[in-house]
C-alpha cells in the first residue's frame, strides 16, 4: 500500500506542468524558468500563481548586496510577462519592428519591382536590336556598351595609302603596321582587319581569273583541230601529198600531171615501191 500511495503521489505531482516550480519563495527569488519539457503541443493556460507576493518581490528586482551586476527590469522578461498576464509565451515575446527593407536587401531593388534583373552582360540590349523596345521585357534601362564594335568608315586618303601598301606587300609586318596606324590615324586592329579582308578579296579575284583562263585556253586548243578536220576538197588538192617511201615519183608529179607535161605511160597517182612502173610497149 505504501508503494501505491507513493506512485499515485508522484503521478499527481507530474500532472501539473508547473508543479516543480512551487516552493517557498526566497527573499531574492529569481524569475522562474519557463516550462521547457513540454513537447510541440500548445501549452495549456497556466493556473494562477499561488504566491502573489513573489511577483511583487520579482518586480522590485534583486537586492544590491546579492548580485553586484545590474539586473534588467523583470517587466521586460517574457517569462515574467507570461506568468503575470496569464498569456501564452508566444504572444508575450516582443516582435521585431518591421523595417521598410528586409535584412540584406538594397533599397534600389524594391524601388522598381517590375524591373527585370539581368545577371549576364550578353543579355543586355544593344543598339542593333531595336525590336526589343516593342515587347514587354524591353522596359528595363539599357546601359551604354563601350565594347560594342562599330563599322569603320575609311576615308579616300586612308584607302589610297592602304591600297598602295597592299600593292607592294600582301602581308604587312608589325613595325609597318604601327607606322601606318600612326600615319593614317587608325588602330593596328583596323589595319590588320583591312588587310585580312583585302587578301580574301584578292584571292577570290585570282581564282576567278584562273578559272576563266583555263576555259578560254581549252577552247583555243580545240578550235584548230576542228578547222583541220573540216576542210574542202579543193584545199586537199592544193596541198602536196606526202612523198612515198621509195621516191619513184618526184614531189612535183601531181602538179606536172595536172599541167599535162607527163608522158602517157606514167600515172599522176603515187605507186608503192614494190611495184615497178610500166614501160610503154614497143610496136612490132
Curated annotation (Swiss-Prot):
The modification Phosphothreonine is found at residue 152. GO terms for molecular function: chromatin binding; DNA-binding transcription factor activity, RNA polymerase II-specific; RNA polymerase II cis-regulatory region sequence-specific DNA binding. It is found in: Nucleus; Cytoplasm, Cytosol. Residues 212-221 have a biased composition (Gly residues). Coiled coil: none annotated. It comes from the Eukaryota. Residues 13-74 are annotated as: Transactivation domain. The modification Phosphoserine is found at residue 269. One of its GO terms (biological process) is negative regulation of endoplasmic reticulum stress-induced intrinsic apoptotic signaling pathway. A motif (Antp-type hexapeptide) lies at residues 119-124. A motif (Nuclear localization signal) lies at residues 198-204. Its main location: nucleus. Disulfide bonds: none annotated. One of its GO terms (cellular component) is nucleus. Gene3D superfamilies: Homeodomain-like. Phosphorylated by the SAPK2 pathway at high intracellular glucose concentration. Phosphorylated by HIPK2 on Ser-269 upon glucose accumulation. This phosphorylation mediates subnuclear localization shifting. Phosphorylation by PASK may lead to translocation into the cytosol. Interacts with the basic helix-loop-helix domains of TCF3(E47) and NEUROD1 and with HMG-I(Y). Interacts with SPOP. The Antp-type hexapeptide mediates heterodimerization with PBX on a regulatory element of the somatostatin promoter. This is Pancreas/duodenum homeobox protein 1. It comes from Gorilla gorilla gorilla (Western lowland gorilla).
Amino acid at each position: 500500500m505504501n508503494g501505491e500511495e507513493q506512485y499515485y503521489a508522484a503521478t499527481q505531482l507530474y500532472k501539473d506542468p508547473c508543479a516543480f516550480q512551487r516552493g517557498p519563495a526566497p527573499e531574492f527569488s529569481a524569475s522562474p524558468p519557463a516550462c521547457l519539457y513540454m513537447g510541440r503541443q500548445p501549452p495549456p493556460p497556466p493556473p494562477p500563481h499561488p504566491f502573489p507576493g513573489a511577483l511583487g518581490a520579482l518586480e522590485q528586482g534583486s537586492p544590491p548586496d546579492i548580485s553586484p551586476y545590474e539586473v534588467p527590469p523583470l517587466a521586460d522578461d517574457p517569462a515574467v510577462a507570461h506568468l503575470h498576464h496569464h498569456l501564452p509565451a508566444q504572444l508575450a515575446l516582443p516582435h521585431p519592428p518591421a523595417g521598410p527593407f528586409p535584412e540584406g536587401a538594397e533599397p534600389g531593388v524594391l524601388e522598381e519591382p517590375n524591373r527585370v534583373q539581368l545577371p549576364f552582360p550578353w543579355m543586355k540590349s544593344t543598339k542593333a536590336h531595336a525590336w526589343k523596345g516593342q515587347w514587354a521585357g524591353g522596359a528595363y534601362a539599357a546601359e551604354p556598351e563601350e565594347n560594342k564594335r562599330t563599322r569603320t568608315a575609311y576615308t579616300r586618303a586612308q584607302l589610297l595609302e592602304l591600297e598602295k601598301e597592299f600593292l607592294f606587300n600582301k602581308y604587312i609586318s608589325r613595325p609597318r603596321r604601327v607606322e601606318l596606324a600612326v600615319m593614317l590615324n587608325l588602330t593596328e586592329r583596323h589595319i590588320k582587319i583591312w588587310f585580312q579582308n583585302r587578301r580574301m578579296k584578292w584571292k577570290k579575284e585570282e581564282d576567278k581569273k584562273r578559272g576563266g583562263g583555263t576555259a578560254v585556253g581549252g577552247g583555243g586548243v580545240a578550235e584548230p583541230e576542228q578547222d583541220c578536220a573540216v576542210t574542202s576538197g579543193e584545199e586537199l588538192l592544193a596541198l602536196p601529198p606526202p612523198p612515198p617511201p621509195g621516191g619513184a615519183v618526184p614531189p612535183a608529179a601531181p602538179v606536172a600531171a595536172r599541167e599535162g607535161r607527163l608522158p602517157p605511160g606514167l600515172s599522176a597517182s603515187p605507186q608503192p615501191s614494190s611495184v615497178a612502173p610500166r614501160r610503154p610497149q614497143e610496136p612490132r
